[in-house]
Amino acid sequence: MEFPFGSLETTNFRRFTPESLVEIEKRIAAKQAAKKAKGKHREQKDQEEKPRPQLDLKACNQPPKFYGELPAELVGEPLEDLDPFYSTHRTFMVLDKGRTISRFSATRALWLFSPFNLIRRTAIKVSVHSWFSLFITVTILVNCVGMTQTELPDRIEYVFTVIYTFEALIKILARGFCLNEFAYLRDPWDWLDFSVITLAYIGEATALRGISGLRTFRVLRALKTVSVIPGLKVIVGALIHSVRKLADVTILTVFCLSVFALVGLQLFKGNLKNKCVKNCAALNETGNYSSYGKQEWNFCHRDEDFYYNKPGTSDPLLCGNGSDAGHCPKGYLCLKTSDNPDFNYTSFDSFAWAFLSLFRLMTQDSWERLYQQTLRASGKMYMVFFVLVIFLGSFYLVNLILAVVTMAYEEQNQATIDEIEAKEKTFQETLEMPRKEQEVLAALGIDTASLHSCNGSPLPSKNASERMRRMKPRVSEGSTDDNKSPQSDPYNQRRMSFLGLTSGRRRASHGSVFHFRTPCLDTSFPDGVTDDGVFPGDRESHRGSLLLGGGTSQQGPLLRSPLPQPPNPGSGHGEDGHSTLPTGELAPGGIEVSAFDAGQKKTFLSAEYLNEPFRAQRAMSVVSIMTSVLEELEESERRCPPCLTSFAQKYLIWECCPTWVKLKTVLFGIVTDPFAELTTTLCIVVNTVFMAMEHHGMSSAFEAMLQIGNIVFTVFFTAEMVFKIIAFDPYYYFQKRWNIFDCIIVTVSLIELGAARKGSLSVLRTFRLLRVFKLAKSWPTLNTLIKIIGNSVGALGNLTIILAIIVFVFALVGKQLLGENYRDNRRNISAPNEEWPRWHMHDFFHSFLIVFRILCGEWIENMWACMEVGQKSICLILFLTVMVLGNLVVLNLFTALLLNSFSADNLATPDEDGEVNNLQVALARIQAFGHRTKKAICNFFTRPCLLPWPKAEPQLVVKLPLSSSKAENHIAANAAVGSPGGLSVSRGLRDDHSDFITNPNIWVSVPIAEGESDLDDLEEDGEEDSQSSQQEVILQGQEQLQVETCEGHTAPRSPGSGMSSEDLASYVDEKWKDEAVAQAPAEGGDDSSSSGGSTVDCLDPEEILRKIPELADDLEEPDDCFTEGCLRRCPCCKVDISKFPWTVGWQVRKTCYRIVEHSWFESFIIFMILLSSGSLAFEDYHLDQKPTVKALLEYTDRMFTFIFVLEMLLKWVAYGFKKYFTNAWCWLDFLIVNISLISLIAKILQYSDVASIKALRTLRALRPLRALSRFEGMRVVVDALVGAIPSIMNVLLVCLIFWLIFSTMGVNFFAGKFGRCINKTNEYFSLVPLSIVNNISDCKYQNHTGSFFWVNVKVNFDNVAMGYLALLQVATFKGWMDIMYAAVDARDVNLQPKWEDNVYMYLYFVIFIIFGGFFTLNLFVGVIIDNFNQQKKKLGGQDIFMTEEQKKYYNAMKKLGSKKPQKPIPRPLNKYQGFVFDIVTKQAFDIVIMVLICLNMITMMVETDEQSAEKTKILNKINQFFVAVFTGECVMKMFALRHYYFTNGWNVFDFIVVVLSIGSLVFSVILTSLENYFSPTLFRVIRLARIGRILRLIRAAKGIRTLLFALMMSLPALFNIGLLLFLVMFIYSIFGMASFPHVSWEAGIDDMFNFQTFANSMLCLFQITTSAGWDGLLSPILNTGPPYCDPNLPNSNGSRGNCGSPAVGILFFTTYIIISFLIVVNMYIAVILENFNVATQESSEPLSEDDFDMFYETWEKFDPEATQFITFSALSDFADTLSGPLRIPKPNQNILIQMDLPLVPGDKIHCLDILFAFTKNVLGESGELDSLKANIEEKFMATNVSKASYEPIATTLRWKQEDISATVIQKAYRSYVLHRSMTISNPPAVPRAEEAVPPPDEAFVEFMVNENCALPDKSETASAASFPPSYDSVTRGLSDQINMSTSSSMQNEDEGTSKKVTAPGP
């Protein structure tokens, strides 16, 4: 068989000629003829797979290299299409210079130009030319820039229009206009171009030039960039894909929002118009309402001045008439006015406005404002409404959108991966071909060697020597460069992933050719052909290079490094000091490091294979492809041409005189020493601290110190760089990215130092901050996170461009449509003393800012402003489009990518797992030194301050020789850790390790319980005492040492437990053996598992002791009181419980133990905890006015304290100190009880007013934490959180470091510049105009009235800590406006700000929001979700050990088992009832009712506030009509269904709704008179319950049901998280009441929202759970004195002042936000994402819940008595009646017989047997089915115990065979009888003839039996002849013996029958 691709010498590209066209026509004709012929054979046609276009020959792709080089003369020329798919299409392809494919139609363009026409060919050549697309791209960009300018002459527009027209003409000439394949208008992107051009001409043609609408369409030109850049099209595809996927979520969201909007409409309509109005009755002194009085009253309540404004704002104060609503101050009344707040746009007055408000709530945009307004107007109890909307609406729906987008993204990713894998497979098959051929030839016995000689091997076009030359420099590069691999730049990464060369993140697919790490596989043959066989798989190469330098593992043994050998220390050393030896040298273990050998075992084509010429030639052709692929890769990899490479090698590798070499050696030693890295790291940290110490108002001495520090550090880092350059040579130094990074920073620092004298360059100073990132070298988490952000930015390159285009387009649209409106009407929305509003669209920059702000999620306020100045409809459409498109889709795609890079690049990647970095080595050495010193001191004082060490003295390897490899460092480090444990670093250790390093095929199985890497323990403090020395890391292969250590232990008798450790050992042994067996599979427990610390190997007494609490539970006896350590040190603690006094003590302990373990005791304690927590809620602001309550609380406080102390003492006695104090929950109890005890004692001793005691009293708020350990649900969540804490902390640290850079920049830019002069008039603070006050001295000078104050903005950048707070407000988008305005207005220190003086400072915040806010906050989501997934894997049950197939079966079966056939409701006998029954059970009836429910919902939407009396009347009538209809429906159903009506949940629901509706009608009539006392809104809401009935419709909508199913699945987990959140809120609200009851009312704190009572605190905390409005609550707490507050104001409880305490406030709010917003809310997201995935998987399974429901519903019709059986005759109809995948349409008799179903007497079949068979029919054959079937049968038998147990007596197949046999026998017998009668009536002429003819029946029967036995048997469970005893059926009897006997008796029967059948007839 010839090699499929041909060789590379020949080219596969052929010109497209008229002959080619003729060929195509012939093929098309042939195809049509074939089609006609096939039309007759329909069935075959269905089975045949339709051809599809080849993936790698798609348009815009490049054809793979193996198609050969493209000759220059064919560039841009029409060529025959390579893709077989297009062989029957009239098309041809054209390749440009970059080999990119374009396809064109071969028909005439515009009916004129054939493909061979000169004009068309020129047009084609131009259109595919790279310069053409470049020209168009540049034009578009220039045009975009032009559009951002406000005034541009029209002439420029004409130029652009002409260019676009020219482009369109060329494309139309080349492609044709629209009729044919690949024509101009067949590409949707060209529609865009076409519309842009057409609109431009229409705009010019019409005289209506004023239509700015048409001009806006020019903006669409920006979208043309998408059509020019190919990568963008893909991303847009993904976006469109995800928008499609969002359909279901959108429907669900609209439905939920509509329901909530209706509820809001009924509850709150008209309420927001209630305002505090001056009491005008007081004005009318006469008090009698004359007509004049009325006029005055009207005038009074209409006038703006008569509204009372909220202090500090210009908003009128809202109020309500309810008891818990907001109240008005004295002299004001609460009245309903005509306007709503916020320009009259915020209201619930009609459905549309309510819907907008609800949408705003869902997107959480300034929802705290709506929340406060509504609660103030309606009452605090309506907080419940907001809780529901925020948790169910906002969190759930918004996160569902995230889940859907993530899913769409992953699906597309998966598709790409599948594509790559398909490609790999083809290559693999290609490689296999020669081998198969070889086998065939060998089988034929042909001597292959004599067949061919390998002379004409078609080698690739580039000669081998050139390739060798090119590879050599790369070997040397590889030898020093750890990081440099083809994955370096994103382009290559994409290229490689396209070829399957992924970065090793994805598991290597089996036998993939393409998984290798470096492109130069230098396993060179003499002739330079790469042997493709030697690709050590990804894992192996990683193992190989684990402890040696990056490059070694791939180099073959034959190559010599071109670098000079040993005298040059740089020859083979990686920059981190890992020796990467020149190949061929020996690694330190004395073992040759040759991954070549390792790889050889996995070769596809080994070297010996190539010896035989015939095989070699075959392989060469394979190799030629492979090398070409590699070459392609190499070309993309090579950054510079060969001439530059040789230049670099010549001049950038410095080999001079021996002295220089000596200097290099010395420097090399210094630079690569681990301590050098430690020093550098410390310097970076200290330097960072120095930079963070800058602040406003530094003393000159402090400033000088910082300056000197800066110089010192700059010098240090410069020296480090110079040393490294000398030690490594520039050539190698600059190949590491870190070094380039260092070099840039050092250079910038030097420039800054030089320039500092001339003037401060604060911009350059910020560059020094980037040094922080150098920490990433030694801090894996930071490294990983930077990588994640890097990966995302790489992958997001295209997405970022799309986002930029969206922002750009919308900013332009806004500017074009609304710019003039903003200019003309700006007075409507700007502040009184400002020229322009802050946010407008008059120029491009401000327009961009508005769009950016919408993307941040703040759209509503700008939209109100826009609606004030422009057309309302345009504003609504524009803002909502940006919001939905930009915010929801694009930002979610970002998040999806971030999450994706998390799953790809785990926080513990293998790279960090195996590699020990120098920092850890240095720390290990220090630790070892510390141990030695400690030991020496102990020996010196010779007293047992510590337990004696084990005897074996370790030989420490501390001084590492210069040439040491990383392996040795690793060993040294391990020795350093292991040394105190007494492990000697023996030869065995070295050998084992070397073996592990050099032989990648050794499996190292590590027990799951051990830490992530051998050196994790180093990260703990170095103070392990002797107890933990056994837990030290024990190296692989050291079990014998461990056993010795174990045996060396003495096990003292433990006095408490009554049995010694040895006694326990046997008990434990048994217990743990089982555990070990259970764990084995989890540990991959094969024989090769060499788990060092496995418990089974040796029972460590300490382990036993650690397990004692568990055993104690089993033994029902208390533990020891003290730990073993205490007993050893204080022998007096040992007691003998058999002696007198201790016996009594032991009995007491046992009694206490029983009390404490009793469930009632626990319940009592929980009750007490709840009561004591509840009592804390009463200690509020008003407590001093309630002396009785106060006294009661004091008394109960003492009581609770006594009870808890008693509980603690009981537990001490019962559990012993050891168990009590080793339990974290007990510690928590202990601390909280102590706090209560101390505060109680202080109170008794009259010290309660001391500040520290007061602080302690506030800590009593922690009491509810004790409930945590008692409630299982919360405990689970807390455990999960605690598990996530390490990674959350890691991310938090990284975020802090990221933010540190921005904070320091902020300090550099804004320190001290936020000061301003304000004028305090009444409660309102206004900025003094710049014309009056210019600076701080003016402010003091002008202060005649004493109302001028020079103040600083409360949240500022005066120091780094304050900067962090400012950044937190910016990142959460709360309070960021004030900070931003201050920054933009700031001029300089002590100068009065000027409006937008520094407008481009906005960009500082934009950049921070993108990197600091967006990335880092999303990293939290990523980390938390990632962490939960890992925890789930650890705790995972059977799912992890199940294949995907098994899971599908398992889930299908799970659903099966839970269902059983139900009896249908019998039809009533009474004919009237029967008639109604028929109506009610028809589907049409249900549909009519549904339509009515929808109509009812619509009529409810029509209601508005202040509607006319007429409308109210009509709506009431309609409402009564609907109530009547639904009542009628209810009555009819009850009449027809009798008592069965209440068996259906939906019916009960309907019944309740009807009763409530009637009730509300009756009440509303009665209560019209009492309306003042009782609000009928509640009854209105009850009517809404009807909407719930719409949910019944949802059964039809599968997608939406999946989403609701996901919600139902999430509910338990969400409830637990909600409980935990409530607990946190409870604790914080009590803290708040204790700390901030007296703060002044301003910003977010007022008479309703404050920390004075428990209820008010909860209102505030619920609001900031979503981080909304926390800046407003924090603002008054930051006040420290005038003008904002008065520290001497007396308070009700005797304390003074209404100022806050900033430190406590900041701590309180930041911790609460981190806990609630970042953690709890993110857990919510994690749960929803998880369950959404599960739900989608379930819904995408071939069989869903509905299919089984449908099965049983159909079954009910065939089995009305619910006997669980139907007759065989009914089966065919039944199978045909089913719907969905289970249906088997008629004719189905044969299929059903083939299913071989068991029959019971009466020819009946059991429902479960049918269901199994049908399920098997859908899912196909599988081994797992049988075991699952057994489970389901058990379940089913348990739930449906039938009275009689039916035994199957046959199966359908056997029944059919018997049936056929019977017919045959009957026929034969009849013919025999007939024959016989004939012979009797006509006696034969020849008497002997009868003997000659055999009786016909014998032959017949024999033939028929044979034939029937050979009937095809699909099921393989029962054969035609017999029943095997193992046959499973539901209907089987209970015991196995019965089964055996029945089947054997059947067998006997069988044999009997067959004998009878084959016996000759009479």
UniProtKB/Swiss-Prot annotation:
Highest taxon, organism lineage: Eukaryota
Disulfide bonds: C276-C328, C866-C875
Major location (coarse): membrane
Expression sites (tissue/organ): Expressed in nodose ganglia, but not in cortex, hippocampus, cerebellum, liver, heart and skeletal muscle.
Keywords: Cell membrane, Disulfide bond, Glycoprotein, Ion channel, Ion transport, Membrane, Phosphoprotein, Repeat, Sodium, Sodium channel, Sodium transport, Transmembrane, Transmembrane helix, Transport, Ubl conjugation, Voltage-gated channel
Feature: compositional bias, Acidic residues: 1015-1026
SUPFAM superfamilies: Voltage-gated potassium channels
Membrane topology: Multi-pass membrane protein
Ranges in the topological domain labelled Cytoplasmic: 1-125, 175-187, 233-248, 409-668, 729-736, 783-798, 900-1154, 1218-1223, 1272-1290, 1426-1478, 1538-1543, 1602-1616, 1730-1962
Compositional bias ranges of the Basic residues kind: 33-42
Transmembrane segments: 126-149, 155-174, 188-206, 213-232, 249-272, 383-408, 669-693, 705-728, 737-756, 763-782, 799-819, 874-899, 1155-1178, 1192-1217, 1224-1245, 1250-1271, 1291-1318, 1399-1425, 1479-1502, 1514-1537, 1544-1567, 1580-1601, 1617-1639, 1705-1729
Entry's Gene Ontology BP terms: membrane depolarization during action potential; neuronal action potential; regulation of atrial cardiac muscle cell membrane depolarization; regulation of heart rate
CDD domains: Na_channel_gate
Glycosylation-annotated residues: N284, N288, N321, N344, N828, N1319, N1335, N1343, N1693
Entry's localization field: Cell membrane
Key word Glycoprotein present: yes
Polar residues biased stretches: 452-463, 1928-1947
Intramembrane segments: 351-375, 844-864, 1361-1382, 1654-1676
III repeats by residue range: 1147-1456
Ranges per topology, Extracellular: 150-154, 207-212, 273-350, 376-382, 694-704, 757-762, 820-843, 865-873, 1179-1191, 1246-1249, 1319-1360, 1383-1398, 1503-1513, 1568-1579, 1640-1653, 1677-1704
Reactions performed catalytically: Na(+)(in) = Na(+)(out)
Record PANTHER family: SODIUM CHANNEL PROTEIN TYPE 10 SUBUNIT ALPHA, VOLTAGE-GATED CATION CHANNEL CALCIUM AND SODIUM
Domain free text: The sequence contains 4 internal repeats, each with 5 hydrophobic segments (S1, S2, S3, S5, S6) and one positively charged segment (S4). Segments S4 are probably the voltage-sensors and are characterized by a series of positively charged amino acids at every third position.
Reported function: Tetrodotoxin-resistant channel that mediates the voltage-dependent sodium ion permeability of excitable membranes. Assuming opened or closed conformations in response to the voltage difference across the membrane, the protein forms a sodium-selective channel through which sodium ions may pass in accordance with their electrochemical gradient. Plays a role in neuropathic pain mechanisms.
Protein family (similarity comment): Belongs to the sodium channel (TC 1.A.1.10) family. Nav1.8/SCN10A subfamily.
Name of the protein described by the UniProt record: Sodium channel protein type 10 subunit alpha
Gene expressing this chain: SCN10A
